[in-house]
């Protein structure tokens, strides 16, 4: 039995009782990485020397003081979250050898909690993708079946947890990039409310949509990790000054009287029968525990995909303009003048998907098209947000599938961008509205790949999401299933 089959609270107890050491946990990670990483390819950079040194330092503290719950726990960090002195590439050749000079706020908080960073995790380049096939280095594979994608863009973060390489990880979610890979890899992934977790030190893709969040094996562990990284940060102008409650207190298993809304758009056209049936089965479980559900409508959901790609690509066009070969990152050698420097550095450094989105965003922001595309997309975004507010006036949570289907095979959709984009039709509306949502395992498809249940909550009401997710998790056994590599 792996140490990582235990929960955070169980491992914390074992550490305090000196049944195990922090070094044991770190070595568990690196041994598992040595065994499976050649196949999974979840990591881009390992930090073995520093991790082992930190483990020895923490071992000396066991029993000497009151250590927090995350003390000594091994974590993986998505490679678009900056780490001081530890290579951060965003899975892009343009940042292939970039060593940041500061830590992201979430990394500072994790260090303060005495977690140990095992390494940096693979992803779609600059978080643009749904399969991890857009990594500038190599594609991560799904631990449940190496012929399948792990999802994206936080594919490395989800795969590392599913493969038992780390206890938990951090990802980022712009249009589903935590929840979709969590669903595909059979783990738990939460996108917090926009502003709940500081974005300081997250390399920006789309600043009005990006949010850092936890990926774990269980809902309880997810709540522990969110508790540690949440809160106001003066270094992030979009960080919200909203009290962080005790997420663990609500994990009682009680959902009696809970009012669930199920959007007809989330079970209709484009959603596979397996995903639909898994949600209906989950609703029966929750109904049996005293919750009630009704069908509702989110009428503007049909515009979410187009709205998202216009807005996110427009923001990416602006955010990625900083990668020009002048200040940091790779610089082209094929240069005769300043224009060559900009053009050749970006042409050589960015992958095809990143270039595609930069071009789309630049077009949407260009003179003569701004009102027709970008401004109109912002107006539709407001309508989508209003849809959620109208539903939440009468219901506690919204439930539906995380993805339309289980994971697909490597290479199956890589040459068809529109088909690839459609994988996010159920997760994107959440980002546009800024509300929180979690994906928890809820079954398997005919291809024996995991399915995810998406539970969406009101702004800053992660506590209710966790309560529902935990109740469902404890009433079923999907969270006990493991990928067998």
Swiss-Prot record:
Please verify whether the record's keywords include Protein biosynthesis: yes
- In the UniProt entry, which residues are flagged as the active site? 78, 153, 177
Q: Which gene encodes it?
A: gatA
Gene Ontology terms for molecular function = ATP binding; glutaminyl-tRNA synthase (glutamine-hydrolyzing) activity
Its EC number is 6.3.5.7
Q: Could you say which protein family the record assigns here?
A: Belongs to the amidase family. GatA subfamily.
Q: Which reaction does it catalyse?
A: L-glutamyl-tRNA(Gln) + L-glutamine + ATP + H2O = L-glutaminyl-tRNA(Gln) + L-glutamate + ADP + phosphate + H(+)
What subunit structure does UniProt give?
A: Heterotrimer of A, B and C subunits.
* Protein name stated in the entry: Glutamyl-tRNA(Gln) amidotransferase subunit A
Q: Origin, by domain of life?
A: Bacteria
Classification via InterPro entries:
Amidase, Amidase_CS, Amidase_dom, AS_sf, GatA
Q: Name one GO biological process term.
A: translation
Entry keyword set:
ATP-binding, Ligase, Nucleotide-binding, Protein biosynthesis
Q: How is this protein annotated for GO cellular component? A: glutamyl-tRNA(Gln) amidotransferase complex
- Report the function annotation for this chain: Allows the formation of correctly charged Gln-tRNA(Gln) through the transamidation of misacylated Glu-tRNA(Gln) in organisms which lack glutaminyl-tRNA synthetase. The reaction takes place in the presence of glutamine and ATP through an activated gamma-phospho-Glu-tRNA(Gln).
